[in-house]
């Protein structure tokens, strides 16, 4: 049957002389694979449309008996090349689409995840964007959508409200506990064997502020670059623990080196 959907291009592979096979994440069907015949022919109207990171409106000839569906038409909605190419933007882009590609299953519709992905890419493709801050926000929302939302307002062990306890005890550090995920008071976490990491209260408050932000624009969270780097390193470790498929891939190491320069 003929169907229309909006999709994010996650990966493109050359196929035969002039075609492409792409992994895409769609609004209606989740992740799927498509073939675009003649997509590498410069005379083809669809040439250039199916590049990683593009958001496109597609027309598909879809058959449930096929693993790879046929794309017959499409129009560009968003591109990382607009307003202009940026190395740091592409480094963040490939981290994001890599996470989605490796942690989702084919043919499982997830509209909240699609909305998160396209909303993040739309913001990423703007000018004057704090790329690292946006990436940290995406990691937190992404892992939360997949069922691993960390507890950031109350102690993950005792359930005690964190802000009053921080003020009363004049704390300078809290624990971030990897499993169960969330912040913990030192007195509650001290005897626990759970994997945990001491972090400054300032970093914990930045994490809470990030969680409360609908979609960061510019430098909406006031933090220096080192703090943002610490944030997304913490969240990367948290995601890697809970999303096994996101662990240890070479391309993540490469873009990490780019971002940390």
From Swiss-Prot:
Task: Provide GO CC annotations from the record.
Answer: bacterial nucleoid
Q: Does the keyword DNA repair apply?
A: yes
Q: Where do the TM regions start and end?
A: none
Q: For this entry, list what GO says about its biological process.
A: DNA recombination; double-strand break repair
What the entry lists under Pfam families is as follows: RecO_C, RecO_N
> Has UniProt tagged this entry with the keyword S-adenosyl-L-methionine?
no
Keywords, in A-Z order: DNA damage, DNA recombination, DNA repair
Checking PANTHER family in the record gives: DNA REPAIR PROTEIN RECO
**What does the UniProt record say this protein does?**
Involved in DNA repair and RecF pathway recombination.
Family named by the database record: Belongs to the RecO family.
What is the protein name stated in its UniProt record?
DNA repair protein RecO
Source species = Pelodictyon phaeoclathratiforme (strain DSM 5477 / BU-1)
The opening ranks of the lineage are: Bacteria, Pseudomonadati, Chlorobiota, Chlorobiia, Chlorobiales
